[in-house]
């Protein structure tokens, strides 16, 4: 194993352009790149700049296209709540496609930034893949992080939308996310356009600002994004 790894590593160092040209063949491209590495403006190198792909398509759709849609794509197993669930590629793509439509309904377009401030639940994965599906850039912030830290990430990313949940569960305690998010929004110089909040069962919170919308509501009105 170590010899194989060392050989691959050496190849990546000795001829990185050739190495990553071959690696690119392992994923799906809508348009294969002909320019592998642009070194004209160091240190701002550009990889695959004329290629077109989609990471959500590579994570989900390609497996469905290959006849594996019924296979398990995601397993959720919470040691805190004891909840367990599985999602096939088809089921996960459906959830992702609908939430991608919900993001677009909230004004999120290609290149826009979305902060994901959530516990480790399936909806966090859905949100990440939905951003990738429409070409938005997501920034994951650890759920429960202090308000000032979240505020700095709002300012750094200039996020248009923040996706969060009503709370997170940790050993021996429940962390209410909404007060932390509210304070972060007050502290941040950059102001988000919308907050999408997923209501966790039994721990629902009141949404009081026009900028605040529930995950359940936006999903119910959204169309899937192919």
Language-model segments: residues:
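A local structural motif
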Residues: 137, 224-226
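N-lobe entry segment of adenylate-forming
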Residues: 1-87, 91-94, 98, 180, ...
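Generic, well-ordered alpha-helical scaffold segments in large soluble proteins
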Residues: 63, 95, 99-102, 106, ...
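Structural core segment of the AMP-binding/adenylate-forming
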Residues: 133-217
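Conserved AMP-binding/adenylate-forming core of the ANL superfamily
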Residues: 56, 74-129, 146, 150, ...
């Amino acid at each position: 194993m170590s010899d194989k790894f060392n050989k691959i590593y050496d190849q990546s160092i000795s001829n990185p352009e050739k190495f990553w040209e071959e690696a690119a063949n392992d994923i799906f491209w809508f348009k294969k790149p002909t320019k592998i590495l642009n070194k004209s403006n160091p240190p701002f190198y550009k990889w695959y700049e004329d290629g077109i792909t989609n990471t959500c398509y590579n994570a989900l759709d390609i497996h469905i296209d290959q006849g594996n849609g019924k296979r398990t794509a995601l397993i959720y197993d919470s040691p805190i709540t004891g909840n367990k669930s599985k999602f096939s590629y088809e089921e996960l793509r459906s959830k992702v496609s609908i939430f991608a439509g919900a993001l677009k309904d909230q004004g999120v377009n290609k290149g826009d930034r979305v902060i994901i401030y959530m516990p480790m639940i399936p909806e966090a994965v859905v949100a990440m893949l939905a951003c990738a599906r429409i070409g938005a850039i997501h920034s994951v912030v650890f759920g429960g992080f202090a308000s000032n830290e979240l505020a700095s990430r709002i300012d750094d990313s200039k996020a248009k939308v923040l996706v969060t949940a009503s709370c997170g569960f940790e050993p021996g305690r429940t962390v209410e996310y909404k007060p932390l998010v509210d304070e972060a929004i007050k502290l941040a110089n950059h102001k988000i356009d919308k907050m999408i909040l997923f209501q966790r069962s039994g721990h629902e919170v009141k949404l009081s600002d026009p900028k605040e919308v529930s995950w359940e509501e936006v999903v119910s009105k959204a169309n899937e994004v192919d």
